[in-house]
């Protein structure tokens, strides 16, 4: 080995640099006894050689070879220089280079020659490729985690941008039944129909005696009921302001529009505001018994409890009005007819009307009290009809 290096570098004399090597080796720390027997070149299988102990190992080997055989001093120096050149400059040891055998070729000889020309400069100049730093595995995992996190967080970011300021209010998820569409347009349309059905049901509950199921008939009942309520408000307002004489033309016009103001028959105002003609033959005889029963029941309730009577009339869709107003309406729209209820109900109705004034509550039931002048005595009697 010594002859090989002397042939490659004839100008290199190892014996002339003993002082330099001894000075260089003296700076290397020793972690164990340098006098121990380390002449064996191979490491046992059960002993692990650590890369960070390489300085001490080489120092001990060099001293051992210097003591035992002075002729191998140059070979030890060359071995030391080769190991030093193979080590990274930034103390980061590549585990793959640890098991590589030293190459005593031309590259090693050139490195040794450059070492003696300038030891410090050769370490920094001959191995610039050793100064790169590998990112640790933990950082790479973090970078990958950030990348995957960014991709996973992209859809919520787009959804929040589309939502605008409704982030604080979470929209309830609507589950579609089997066979229903799940696209947003179909869901919105289904919710709209459900809201309409709920509003229609609530509106139907406000109308008394509403028993229609289809929407068209139900809306017709609601329209008629609203018209009747408007008429009642107008009549009561005008009766308070201008008396019964001012109300009679209005009621006559509305009754003629309703088709029930024809002469000859009795006029009964229904719950929808129209005036219906009553036949004096068979229809009057069939409804007389039921009307008499209802009138007696109302009279009994008014004698016992006025509040219960008002609630009963409200359930029938009827109301009470002043006798003077009923007289004006009866005179303008109907002919003279026989009374249908006893006189005590007329007196109670007059008492409830508070001497010609309107109902005490706007929520009072809708009972059209008509009066008729019977005979020559001109006695005012009230007529109740559901």
From Swiss-Prot:
It is found in: Nucleus. It comes from Lotus japonicus (Lotus corniculatus var. japonicus). It comes from the Eukaryota. Expressed in root epidermal cells. GO terms for cellular component: nucleus. This is bHLH transcription factor RHL1. Disruption phenotype: Root-hairless phenotype. One of its GO terms (molecular function) is DNA-binding transcription factor activity, RNA polymerase II-specific. Residues 127-137 have a biased composition (Low complexity). Residues 180-193 are annotated as: Basic motif. Residues 119-186 are annotated as: Disordered. PANTHER family: SPERMATOGENESIS- AND OOGENESIS-SPECIFIC BASIC HELIX-LOOP-HELIX-CONTAINING PROTEIN 2, TRANSCRIPTION FACTOR BHLH83-RELATED. SMART domains: HLH. Transcription factor that regulates the development of root hairs. Residues 138-151 have a biased composition (Polar residues). Residues 180-229 form the bHLH domain. InterPro entries: bHLH_dom, HLH_DNA-bd_sf, IND-like. Keywords: DNA-binding, Nucleus, Transcription, Transcription regulation. Residues 194-229 are annotated as: Helix-loop-helix motif.
């Amino acid at each position: 080995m010594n002859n090989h290096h002397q042939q490659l570098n004839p100008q290199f004399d190892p014996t002339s640099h003993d002082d330099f090597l001894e000075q260089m080796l003296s700076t290397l720390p020793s972690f164990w006894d340098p006098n121990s027997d380390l002449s064996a070149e191979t490491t046992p299988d059960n002993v692990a050689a650590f890369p960070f102990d390489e300085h001490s190992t080489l120092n001990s080997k060099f001293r051992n070879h210097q003591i035992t055989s002075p002729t191998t001093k140059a070979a030890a120096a060359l071995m030391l220089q080769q190991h030093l050149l193979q080590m990274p400059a930034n103390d980061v040891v590549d585990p793959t280079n640890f098991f590589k055998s030293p190459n005593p070729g031309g590259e090693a000889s050139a490195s040794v020659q450059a070492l003696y020309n300038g030891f410090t400069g050769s370490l920094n100049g001959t191995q610039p490729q050793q100064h790169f730093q590998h990112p640790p595995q933990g950082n790479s995992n973090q970078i990958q985690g950030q990348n995957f996190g960014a991709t996973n967080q992209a859809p919520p970011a787009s959804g929040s941008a589309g939502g605008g300021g409704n982030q604080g209010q979470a929209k309830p998820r609507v589950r579609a039944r089997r066979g229903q569409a799940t696209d947003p347009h179909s869901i919105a349309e289904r919710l709209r129909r459900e809201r309409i059905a709920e509003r229609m049901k609530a509106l139907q509950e406000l109308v008394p005696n509403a028993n229609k199921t289809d929407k068209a008939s139900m809306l017709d009942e609601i329209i008629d009921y609203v018209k009747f309520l408007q008429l009642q408000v107008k009549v009561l307002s005008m009766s308070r302001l201008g008396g019964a004489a001012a109300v009679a033309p209005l009621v006559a016009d509305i009754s003629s529009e309703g088709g029930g103001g024809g002469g000859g028959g009795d006029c009964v105002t229904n719950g929808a505001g129209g005036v219906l003609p009553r036949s004096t033959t068979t229809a009057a005889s069939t409804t007389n018994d039921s009307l008499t029963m209802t009138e007696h029941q109302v009279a009994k309730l008014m004698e016992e409890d006025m509040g219960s009577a008002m609630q009963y009339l409200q359930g029938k869709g009827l109301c009470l009005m002043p006798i003077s107003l009923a007289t004006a309406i009866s005179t303008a729209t109907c002919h003279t007819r026989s009374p249908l209820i006893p006189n005590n109900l007329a007196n109670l109705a007059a008492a409830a009307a508070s001497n010609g004034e309107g109902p005490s509550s706007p929520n009072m039931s809708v009972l059209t009290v008509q009066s008729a002048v019977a005979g020559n005595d001109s006695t005012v009697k009230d007529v109740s009809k559901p």
